[in-house]
Amino acid sequence: MKRNIYVFAGESYMVRESFARLKASLDIQMEELNVTVFSEMPPADQLIETCAAVPFLSPVRLVAVRDCTALTAAGDKDEAKKIADYLERLPDTTVLALCVAEAPDKRRTLYKRAAELGTVREFPEPNPAGCVSFVAEQAKKQGARIGRVAAQLLVDLVGCDYYALANEVAKLAVYTGGREITAEDIN
């Protein structure tokens, strides 16, 4: 049976967006008491203690580690093993999200156990063709349109950085006021 365990790994923008979508999909009340986000890897005992806490006036609590080095080769193996051993006992009322902005080490016990019990989403580093598609998707989200040539020009100028591309598309969408974004707007 799948548990409430999520691993988001790889390209940082996609990891952050996936985490944000997960958080938005949960029915969390009193968020300040039922959401704990560690910016870096806490000691295993602290993470386990946080996960074991009962949600307060909410059906679920969210515990997340933004830079889960325990999933990488650089992480502490003993700490990772403690967490891996705990995953099977994770309460049904706790959602655990382990995020890392690089490729995880699939040989790690923690990765294997999380993949077995939960959901793993890996996001490879973007390629230029993927970035052009990303620009088109972002324009659509902003209520704008952009042609393939203009999208390619934007990728050529900005580079294949999802954060920078999303920011530039948002600015262009405001600038164009709903009309199609053209190469002239970008230059």
Task: Cite the ranges covered by each PLM segment.
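Conserved beta/loop motifs at nucleotide-recognition and modification sites
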Residues: 1-187
